[in-house]
Amino acid sequence: MAAAQPKKIRMVAGLGNPGDEYARTRHNAGFCAIDELARQANVTYWKNQSGAEVASINVNDPDAEGGKREVLLVKPQSYMNTSGGPISKLCAANRISAEELLVIHDELDIPAGDVRIKVGGGHAGHNGLRLIIDKLGSRDFSRIRVGIGEPPGRMQVADFVLKQLRAKEAEEFDDAAFRAAEAAALALTRGVIFARDHVNGGASGNGKH
């Protein structure tokens, strides 16, 4: 028996930290992917709502009224570890369930530059995900995981994820953020399961599994 298809995505939230000092750091992979997704969708207006920057896009959906489904793009402005607050408030205000939420975040346990999709699951030590799970009371949301690799040598994790990227690192990071945005767009139009199988199967990215 085939697994049930998750509900269609109505919100894509990218995790990161607000402020220019964090803009070019690994921890802001989610923000960068959301910015790229917004650029591809020609978003020109963001509003401040429930402690987050929020934009709205329409995606093709034959099952929706008028053939379009509204999707919210969200960048919480409460810093990474407390992102669950704004996200849960926006979900409640818009009657969006955990299954209709897609979160884009950095992932230490995946090689730098890799992009993978996961449906549900735990937080794996990621404090941003930890509070989202706590606030929603559910682990059923989908995730796009942007690999950043592990810290070199004895470098602390906090220093690694908040360190400004060097030129070559930034190029790889930007490419991964672009592919994460493409993965999100695919999930919006074709469904999370299709996008997961396509992306994780090596059809997108650098071929690492």
Model features per residue range: what roles?
Residues 1-120, 129-145, 151-156, 171-209:
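Nucleotide and nucleotide-moiety/phosphate-recognizing core
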Residues 116-122, 161-165:
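Short glycine-enriched, charge-decorated loop/helix-capping segments at active-site entrances
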